[in-house]
Amino acid sequence: MKKKINRRTFLKVMGAAALAASAGGLSGCGSTGENGEESTIIRVAFNQPETHAEYIALADFGEKFAAATHGRYQVEIYPNAVLGDQGPVTEMIRTGALQLAVVPMSVPESYNSDFAIIAAPYLYDNLEQMETAAREGVFDPLFATTDKFNFEVVTLYTSGARHIYTNKPITKPEDLKGYKIRVQDSDTYIQMINLMGGVGIAMGQSEVYAAVQQHVIEGGENSEVVYNNFKHYEIAPYFSYTNHLVMTDVVVANKDFLDDMDEDTRTTFRKLMKESMEVEFAAWDQNIEDAKAVLDEHGVTFVEADIEAFRERCMPLLQSIANRSDMTREVYDKVQEIKAREA
């Protein structure tokens, strides 16, 4: 069952997040632990603000891991992409310049194309189905394939269902004709928007506001949270519920860093990382509620789209991803089993 975070718990975790935000520079060592030894600093790259559910989960993890290791490890989170965009950050993870980072699923997909199945267009009917799959370990075999690239996927976070926002209502595929829509740098998502009737344009998130203002593109696709955080309602005030993706981000860790831990510490690290997934799922619900309230205040028009019309357009893409390998077919089939249990 999906866990809900109450207001008291949310504020407590936010307090931990604020404490983590005040952590100092990029050195590999910091204050001393309970045994008098210098603490090892785990540096985490993150491209969203401190109020984001993923930040809250990371801060909660950091507090618990520091306590479990008696201060031998401390977590420092660097939000708002201050350490760079997600592509360069991934290379920093691989080389060991960073220990942890939150990246979109398109990053591991660039190393193993089978990752595309986890966030394939219209694979899920709702966010809860993806969360159930994550809890049941459906994606774990895929996560185990990145070791050879010197990073490990240590947990999964939701970044919510994604929808299209533009300067007009989008209710059916025909409404997107000729509309250039920003997507993550992924061939899959470019194809998806093309099939939905528009033109997919890969672009960094920080470029979207100016690109819409200058009529380089007509809009983007994302969750209510990101739409609000980047104030895209100012330049694209129609938010259309196409529900084309249920997106996930992953926390990736440098493999050498993990291998250098003693076995007990590594086990604790992985356990607490998995538990942070539930913190993030619950905090995400709160993020969505808060974002919608702000968007209402700014006069955003929410539009109900014909989801089945868009889904039908994207089915060939979904099936091509599902049939890519035995591993992708297994993930697809297990998600269908979850859907059947809900029916």
Residue ranges of predicted features:
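Glycine-centered hinge/linker elements that transmit conformational signals in sensory
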Residues: 143-144
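A gly/proline- and charged-residue-enriched helix-loop-helix capping module
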Residues: 130-134
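N-terminal secretory/targeting leader peptides
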Residues: 2-5, 9-19, 24, 30-128, ...
